[in-house]
Amino acid sequence: MKENNEQKNCLNDQYIIKYIDYIKFEKRLSENTIKSYLNDIEKLYSYSKNYYKFISKDINKYLESLDYLDSRSLAHLITVLRSLYAFLNKEGIISHNPCNDVVMPKLKAKLPNYLTIEEVNKLLDINLVKPNDYRNKAMLELCFATGLRVSELVNLKVSDINFNDCYLRVIGKGKKERIVPIDDIALKYVKMYNDYYRNKLLKNKDSEYLFISSYASKITRQAFFKLIKSECAKKGIEKEISPHTLRHSFASVLLKNGANIRVIQELLGHEDLKTTQIYTHLINEKLKKDYEEYHPRSRKE
């Protein structure tokens, strides 16, 4: 992150430096979130170094100049600006948040891509030969069994797993801790990897992290994403894959099998139920399909 930050002109500004320290140390936002915030703040700073003197009409004029942004990017930018100006207001640097009256663009719900059970089973069918294979199998099984974010998965420590009581201690967004149960199958492969193959990847080095790369260090998010894409390509799964594909698949399977959405919210570590409710489209699809199949008046002549 440091390398990227040095390229940002906005980090020469004392108020922005204070704000970044605030979201990093007090709000405890993740490194990736801070990077995305900085990208938007850099846009504002490039537009005007007197951003802290802006009133509502200045903000609206600035937003009008960004007509090349799609609605999702614009909504993210407005969220960042509201947060920045709220901080400046709280610190007494400005007397009013000029973003208070800004209207958010309407967003079409972006439905998460997920794998069917058949596709998941294909993905998890890994030929176990090398230590890397056992690690990959353990990671994929665990990810589908728990719905962990990729960042949570790669940051797991051996001490976070309770093999006796079958649960994980997960440190999620904002350093919030949650307990997530693990099923017997995933636990079996994680234990097998940890007991017999992890040390082979460590090559006599020490690490507190559970999943180890071929370079005897903690595996990265990028490496795991590459693994998912590679395995999907091998298995002929042609869907658009993201780092969260297995997380979405986990939530989708639970919902389709009747799990309470509040339980899914807790397992996924979502602070806001609205974030979890995007998965309810799956229930609506199933209801519609069942209605069309079984209701006599839904059948077309």
Residue ranges and their predicted role:
Residues M1-E301:
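Conserved catalytic core of the tyrosine transesterase superfamily
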